[in-house]
Amino acid sequence: VPSRIGSYWLNDFDGDTEIDVVAVDHQNRQVFAGECKFHAKPVDAPVYFALKEKVDNTAEIHKAFPGYDVLFGVFSKSGFTQRMLDTAKENNRLLLINEDHLA
């Protein structure tokens, strides 16, 4: 169970870095990073790759939580493309969350 949930935003010389959802589970040594997309079209795999790149390039996360596993989540109002579904099947650290999963 996450002990901290929030978002991450940094404005630096490279521009803005924003991660919509960040949750930390100290007991299981996991960090969850999520991207929210509430558009009229299904979300495609580049959204996941961009999120992963943001997390990989965010030194603060790695410094604050060394050795923690990172899980990724993509939230979508309109579902996912086949390419995104295939990407998730190949990656057990990627969760796809659609509108039906939300309370």
Regions found by a protein language model. Give the residues of each.
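A cross-kingdom feature that marks ATP-driven nucleic-acid transaction machinery
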Residues: V1-A103
